[in-house]
């Protein structure tokens, strides 16, 4: 994804991948259990800013979304992803937890050190089966393709080690938040619980954007299950980072041409 390149550096070249090794689900289940809590345009370009668009329902909706994201992006300050480093240079400085995670990654990814959407789906579904308190229909292939796309800095269609580790650390953090804000222990987060959960994850959104998210990711009763919660936060994280990387002067406005806009919206 062309925008992710500017803020997420990691990953290698790409071929096939490995399967789930023996005990892999158990080890990853342990890792995720240990998570800590908290935490419009013709011509050459298309301007995307804080104001609403003119003319037509589609432009009004787009203007509202961009306005909401520009406001929220100004308040979103996540930890930066790790820089690209050669394997041999970083191995000596890795903690024991990271070293074990790298071994795990090699088991999953195989010699090419890349994780495909199918492999990601398998491992996530393996993990959530160990957590009956998390209500989920399971991670589908389309959801995992979207997750890979927004994290795929080199557009190989797969995730390298740093990309996967960054995603995995976020999933651990968001899982803890999900459980903390599931106050009625229903296994889902209701619409009244969502604002607190999103703010704990670092996303301060307005009511209009919350309503759009609920219509897109929640069920008819307004409840969001675990896989939809994670899918939504992965998308928000990527879109906010993309916006902030392009808004270099902090004006709350960005300008992209039609090709950049299509790359941003189609490969995600």
UniProtKB/Swiss-Prot annotation:
Description of the deletion phenotype: Embryonic lethality by 11.5 dpc, with indications of defects in both vasculogenesis and erythropoiesis.
GO molecular function terms attached to this record: calcium ion binding; calcium-dependent cysteine-type endopeptidase activity
Record-listed Ca(2+) 3 binding positions: 182, 184, 186, 188, 193
An example Gene Ontology biological process: proteolysis
UniProt: Ca(2+) 1 binding residues: 109, 112, 114, 119
Gene3D superfamilies assigned to the protein according to its UniProt record, in alphabetical order: EF-hand
Domain EF-hand per the UniProt entry, residue ranges: 96-130, 139-172, 169-204, 205-233, 234-268
PTM-bearing positions, type N-acetylmethionine: 1
Record carries keyword Oxidoreductase: no
Residue(s) carrying N6-acetyllysine: 179
Function (record text): Regulatory subunit of the calcium-regulated non-lysosomal thiol-protease which catalyzes limited proteolysis of substrates involved in cytoskeletal remodeling and signal transduction. Essential for embryonic development.
The name this protein goes by in its record: Calpain small subunit 1
Species name: Mus musculus (Mouse)
Record lineage: Eukaryota, Metazoa, Chordata, Craniata, Vertebrata
Gene name linked to the record: Capns1
């Amino acid at each position: 994804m062309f925008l992710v390149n500017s803020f997420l550096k990691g990953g290698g070249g790409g071929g096939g991948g490995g399967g789930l090794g023996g005990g892999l689900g158990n080890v990853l289940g342990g890792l995720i259990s240990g998570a800590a809590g908290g935490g419009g345009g013709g011509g050459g370009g298309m301007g995307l800013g804080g104001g609403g668009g003119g003319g037509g329902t589609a432009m009004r909706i787009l203007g509202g979304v961009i306005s909401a994201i520009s406001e929220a992006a100004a308040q979103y300050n996540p930890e930066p992803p790790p820089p690209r480093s050669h394997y041999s240079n970083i191995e000596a400085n890795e903690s024991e937890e990271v070293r074990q995670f790298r071994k795990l990654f090699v088991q999953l990814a195989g010699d090419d050190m890349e994780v495909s959407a199918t492999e990601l789906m398998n491992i996530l579904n393996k993990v959530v089966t160990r957590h009956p308190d998390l209500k989920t229909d399971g991670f589908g292939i389309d959801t995992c393709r979207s997750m890979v796309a927004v994290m795929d800095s080199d557009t190989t269609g797969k995730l390298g080690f740093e990309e996967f580790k960054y995603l995995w650390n976020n999933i651990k953090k968001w899982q803890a938040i999900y459980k903390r804000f599931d106050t009625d222990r229903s296994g889902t987060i209701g619409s009244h619980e969502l604002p607190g959960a999103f703010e704990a994850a670092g996303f301060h959104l307005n009511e209009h954007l919350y309503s759009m998210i609920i219509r897109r990711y929640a069920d008819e009763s307004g409840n969001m299950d675990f896989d939809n919660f994670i899918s939504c936060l992965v998308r928000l994280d990527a879109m906010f980072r993309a916006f902030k990387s392009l808004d270099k002067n902090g004006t709350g406005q960005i300008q992209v041409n039609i090709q950049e806009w299509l790359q941003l919206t189609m490969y995600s």
